[in-house]
From Swiss-Prot:
The gene is nuoH. Its main location: membrane. It is an enzyme of class 7 (translocase). The keyword Transferase does not apply. This is NADH-quinone oxidoreductase subunit H.
């Protein structure tokens, strides 16, 4: 069959890898909601969901059925198009950001030379979902939550990007595969420890996770920018948040902890174990830390995180120049 060319085979393999990787990410994001509730129960010395299936193993299925059959209500005075578009953007933005993450040698959806810039672009796109949701709902609590979320996300994305510049300078590339290969001898978390700390803090803030979940504060804003959402639209916001956690955890592994590299076990297993560890850390942080005031969150970012990232970048540049002499 002459129509089967090497180019066609390469395209089909790329599509297959994209479908497999993105399905795994969505599945991990969905199952993390169940795992979080079970782990929170363990951390707080109480029972988690344990009634549906063996040990609560079918709780996720029950939640999905409930979500499918809930009324997909749209407020009467809302902007219907933007109201519907917002959860789609929230779901797809950080899911697309995972496309640049190499899970093992040769297994990456898009091996871009501007991989880190693509991630920052997708993280910035998620801000529009929040603004669209808050403004289109025609609800004052939604709008206040959206304004908080957009200001917080844009602020912490500054530190998110600056914290990665030390890694880029050491690897000499924005390509994620090149960054993983540059950690063959020493993981970046050792020379870039302060960069890792800042990236982890900013990653939690960008995902709007506790303790940086002021945009969704129940006591102040009645659940924030998605108060008017129900049914599958709310489900897209819900799963999108967990996909963001999976993506940020995978980026921590790729940029600072050697990616798929490790002894004895297959590369994908190492990548999965490292990523699962950081996903559990997100849950442990939620169970351990109180929620600060909104002004404290913004002050912490600009007065502590920003100077720390700038000092880390300057020291990294000085070390690289010294080694080049």
């Amino acid at each position: 069959m002459s129509w089967i060319t090497p180019e066609l085979i390469e395209i089909l393999l790329t599509i297959l890898k994209a479908v497999v990787i993105l399905l795994v990410v969505v599945t991990c994001g969905a199952f993390m909601s169940f795992g979080e509730r079970r782990l929170l129960g363990l951390f707080q010395n109480r029972y988690g969901p344990n009634r549906v299936g063996w040990g609560g193993s079918l709780q996720l299925v029950a939640d999905m059925i409930k979500m499918f059959f809930k009324e997909d209500w749209i407020p009467k005075f809302s902007d219907r198009v933007i109201f519907t578009l917002a959860p789609m953007i929230a779901f797809t933005s950080l899911l697309l950001a995972f496309a640049i993450v190499p899970v093992s040698p040769g297994w990456v959806v898009a091996d871009l030379n501007i991989g880190i810039l693509f991630f920052l672009m997708m993280a910035g796109l998620a801000v529009y979902a929040v603004l669209f949701a808050g403004w289109s709902s025609n609800n004052k609590y939604s709008l206040l939550g959206a304004m908080r979320a957009s200001a917080q996300t844009l602020s912490y994305e500054v530190f998110l990007g600056l914290s990665l510049m030390g890694v880029v300078a050491q690897a000499g590339s924005f390509n994620m595969t090149d960054i993983v290969n540059s950690q063959a001898h020493v993981w970046n978390v050792i020379p870039q420890f302060f960069g890792f700390i800042t990236f982890a803090i900013a990653g939690v803030a960008v995902c709007h996770r506790h303790p940086f979940d002021q945009p969704e504060a129940e006591q102040e804003l009645a659940d924030g920018y998605h108060i008017e959402y129900s049914g599958m639209k709310f489900g897209l916001f819900f799963v999108g948040e967990y996909i963001g956690i999976v993506t940020i955890s995978a980026l921590m592994v790729t940029l600072f902890f050697g990616g798929w590299q490790g002894p004895l076990l297959p590369p994908f297993i190492w990548f999965a174990l490292k990523t699962a560890f950081f996903m559990m850390m997100f849950i442990l942080i939620r169970a351990s830390l109180p929620r600060p005031r909104y002004d404290q969150v913004m002050s912490f970012g600009w007065k502590i995180c920003l100077p720390l990232t700038l000092i880390n970048l300057l020291v990294t540049a000085a070390v690289i120049l010294w080694q080049a002499q």
